[in-house]
Amino acid sequence: MTLLYEGKAKRIFSTNQENELRVEYKDEVTAGNGAKKDTMAGKGRLNNQITSIIFKYLQENGIESHFIKQLSETEQLVKPVKIIPLEVVVRNIASGSITKRLGFENGEVFRESLVEFFYKNDALNDPLITDDHIKLLNIATDKDIETLKTKALEINQVLKKLMDAMNLKLVDFKIEFGKTETGQILLADEISPDTCRIWDKATNANFDKDVYRNNTGSLIETYQIFLNKLEDLK
């Protein structure tokens, strides 16, 4: 078993199967592209368990991903994919960077869900890019871009129903996709309170990493409550 990659939140290892990788979720938490950083015991366990439940739910609703199964509290088995260097962001309600960038009021509900692309490049601070930029950088073709948008909006619809069942609002989320050796585009990485902005329907209280970004609550307690809500739906 060889360490293939280590990022801010995860380590990826080879296995004795060519078409399987092991992902280990770390206890590190970051914000602002790593400008704020801490280690919190239990964070890896929570994100692994949450992502495993959500990916299984998505698969049950026709959304294919790299996820195979959960291996332990902090590990899961996934299919190998070549990650497309884009963060695909879907926004249902204005919050975060878009309020500063375009002047929307925080909490403003969009008439239609918005899809944005950000270039995964730490040196450039992951800038917002257009479809034309994506093609100029040879990141993806027109066909791939349309596939990413379609899949992102399909995932949004499924996730909104899931959050609704927990009396939560899906404000926005970011996802990543990868390509298999045959060129199939699959949902990859994770979906957790690290990658989503989730509000309580009644109070607009955060159930996401904004409690850490803004120092408004305990990240571990918040994520545990979110996991409990997910498990209560089973």
UniProtKB/Swiss-Prot annotation:
BP terms from Gene Ontology: 'de novo' IMP biosynthetic process; cobalamin biosynthetic process
Origin: domain of life: Bacteria
EC numbers, comma separated: 6.3.2.6
Pathway: Purine metabolism; IMP biosynthesis via de novo pathway; 5-amino-1-(5-phospho-D-ribosyl)imidazole-4-carboxamide from 5-amino-1-(5-phospho-D-ribosyl)imidazole-4-carboxylate: step 1/2
UniProt xrefs under InterPro entries: SAICAR_synt/ADE2_N (IPR028923), SAICAR_synt_PurC (IPR033934), SAICAR_synth (IPR001636), SAICAR_synthetase (IPR050089), SAICAR_synthetase_CS (IPR018236)
PROSITE patterns, per the entry: SAICAR_SYNTHETASE_1, SAICAR_SYNTHETASE_2
Entry keyword Ligase: yes
Enzyme superclass (EC): ligase
Reaction(s) the record says it catalyses: 5-amino-1-(5-phospho-D-ribosyl)imidazole-4-carboxylate + L-aspartate + ATP = (2S)-2-[5-amino-1-(5-phospho-beta-D-ribosyl)imidazole-4-carboxamido]succinate + ADP + phosphate + 2 H(+)
Disulfide linkage: none
Keywords, ordered alphabetically: ATP-binding, Ligase, Nucleotide-binding, Purine biosynthesis
Entry-linked Pfam families: SAICAR_synt
Gene Ontology molecular functions: ATP binding; phosphoribosylaminoimidazolesuccinocarboxamide synthase activity
Family: Belongs to the SAICAR synthetase family.
Name of protein: Phosphoribosylaminoimidazole-succinocarboxamide synthase
Organism of origin: Staphylococcus aureus (strain bovine RF122 / ET3-1)
Phylogenetic classification of the source organism: Bacteria, Bacillati, Bacillota, Bacilli, Bacillales
Gene label: purC
